[in-house]
Amino acid sequence: MSRTVIVGIDGSPESLAAAEWAAREALLRAVPLHVVHAGEQQPHAYAPFATEAVALPGEDRSARMLHDTEVSLAYRHPGLGITAEHLAGQPATALSAAAREAEVLVLGSRGLGRASGRLFGSVAFAVVGRAERPVVLVRAGAGDTYERRADTRGISGEATPFGDVVLGLRLPGRSAEAVLAFAFDAAARRDAGLRVVHGWNAMPSARVGEGDAEAVEPAELLTETLRPWREKFPGVEVTAEAVIGGPGAHLADVSRDASLLVLGGRLRSRPVGPHMGPVTHEVLQRSLAPVAVVPHR
């Protein structure tokens, strides 16, 4: 794996927002940015992973799009190393393969759409379930000011601190180590707090209230799981909560004030068909913050 951030673009507002977010992420990580456009170059077709159909005026559209994006990002982010490349072939396959060479792959997302209610198109959906590296989905409008806290005047920007990184953590689970490493690293790079949310199910007949014994075990498990990571990242302020029931709606709600939301995602053993848990699916539909899906087996 090379140390780079890769962003896939298609000319949509969502992918342009993803390119800006990816540039800022590359600067945070002190690595180059690689901009890619995936799909066959055809004279009259449609953008391969756009959330809505976008007409292609000619087979040079990909080259023009990549050039314009590279120039625009270089102007806004001087000092950032930027390269661009067209990836031929089936978009989901090409993007998933490209992700193997990156620290993170960034794609645009739509949020809760008016028509379909889906966050992203079929290709991005496939990439999230297939990519072997973390994939970040970014909504249009998720600019730098939305990632940062407002000052006393209600203004946010480069001079104000990042919002918390929010981690949806499933315990016990094989995904814990991978998502914890990604989330703590993201919080440390942003000098931000980390808010960890663990969802658990009480017994159907249990009446759970404050201080009830049923809540002790999940809380203790969460505390013990976080202990070595707190020691490894002493500068990250951590808050943790065990939420009864599915945490999807709660995570989507707290994403309003988050700079990044981190989830685990299981890699599919088969190359076809989506594989995504209900919590991840709900969060991806509703989150206002960029969502990082960290793969695990």
Regions found by a protein language model. Give the residues of each.
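Structural beta-alpha unit
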Residues: 1, 14, 72-105, 112, ...
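Small/aliphatic-rich secondary-structure junction motif
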Residues: 1-53, 160-210, 230-232, 237-238, ...
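Conserved N-terminal glycine/acidic-rich loop preference
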Residues: 16, 20, 27, 33-35, ...
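Short, flexible helix-coil linker/hinge segments at the edges of structured domains or between repeats
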Residues: 77, 142-162
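Glycine-rich, Arg-bearing micro-motifs that act as flexible, cationic patches
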Residues: 107-126, 130, 145-147, 260-286
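Short beta-strand elements of ligand-binding domains
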Residues: 108-109, 135-140, 292-295
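Structured core of small recognition/catalytic domains
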Residues: 192-262, 271-275, 279
